[in-house]
Design a protein with these regions (language model features):
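A short acidic, leucine-rich amphipathic alpha-helix
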Residues: 46-49
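Short alpha-helical segments that sit at the start of domains
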Residues: 2-29
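Amphipathic alpha-helical dimerization/coiled-coil segments
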Residues: 90-109
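Short, Lys/Arg-rich nucleic-acid/phosphate-binding segment
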Residues: 75-82, 88
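Glycine-centered, phosphate/nucleic-acid-interacting loop/turn motifs that mediate DNA/RNA or nucleotide
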Residues: 69
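Short helix-capping/hinge SLiMs at alpha-helix to coil transitions
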Residues: 35-39
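Short, hydrophobic-biased segments on the C-terminal half of alpha helices
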Residues: 62-63
Length: 109
């Protein structure tokens, strides 16, 4: 693409989506945590403990992931919230496939 060409709207959407998914190191760590355990349910405290991030950080990064359709939130009663990788959305399927493909190479880095 030359300097004068405008990026296509599809490119912009994809670029923005990747920026949203990997918005911070904390959010990236949480995404990876769910990708490593795609069939497990987690509450906020367990996510914080297993990712070694502050509970307040987990609370802040979870909502954007839910809004994007990467993580599914399930409310149990009035106070308990459980989270699991959303496996039915295209964005999460593509991300999971990508992660599975690169995972063996991450150990080399």
């Amino acid at each position: 693409m030359s300097k004068n060409e405008e990026p296509s709207p599809k490119y912009i959407k994809t670029e923005n989506l990747l920026e949203k998914i990997f918005a911070s190191r904390a959010q990236t760590r949480v995404v990876q945590h769910f990708l490593d355990r795609p069939k497990e349910f987690f509450n906020l405290s367990r996510i914080a403990k297993e990712t070694e991030l502050a509970h307040s950080t987990i609370h802040r990064v979870m909502q954007p992931l839910v809004d994007m359709g990467l993580i599914k939130e399930i409310r149990v009663g009035q106070q308990i919230r459980l989270f699991i990788l959303e496996t039915e959305q295209d964005v999460s399927k593509i991300l999971a496939k990508f992660y599975d493909d690169i995972k063996p190479h991450l150990k080399e880095l």
